[in-house]
Amino acid sequence: METIWVLGDAVVDLLPDGEGKLLQCPGGAPANVAVGIARLGGRSAFIGRVGDDPFGRFMQKTLADEQVNTEWLRLDPQHRTSTVVVDLDDDGERSFTFMVRPSADLFLDSADLPPFRAGEWLHVCSIALSAEPSRSATFQAMSAIRMAGGFVSFDPNIRADLWHDEVELRECLERALACADVVKISVE
């Protein structure tokens, strides 16, 4: 069975418990995909960075406990783990407040990338494209896996407030879509 690599952010979501407290929960679309693949019996591996902090170690342990290969998940001593407060409105719609910007995941660089092999997949989300050096590393990973004979899955998962420039967002999305063999689209 070939590896399905997932590149991006492993996030600690702080969710309201209904009693005025926030619950610490593992999150981030890429981390959720990696866990889902593992739970379905696939071989998943996570590529990314979290802070060398309590939240980062929590995410590393959570992914490992879920049978996700974390060999390529780096603990970054200089940057903090992405942390998001999730709010629910009366209709159950979510909104996100990103508490740590820039977070460790945005400092992913080419040295953090594994060697890819033919037949493997790489799944990425657009948050990894929102800033350098993660943007360049992500595009490099997409190119490298295609050159090795692998495939790319892309989830636009657009969070416009994380981008400084709408033109840059559009250009990055167009480039990523052109690299993708599969695109995951949702109403959001």
Identify what each model region corresponds to.
Residues 14, 54, 160:
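Feature marks short, surface-exposed loop/turn motifs that line or immediately flank catalytic pockets
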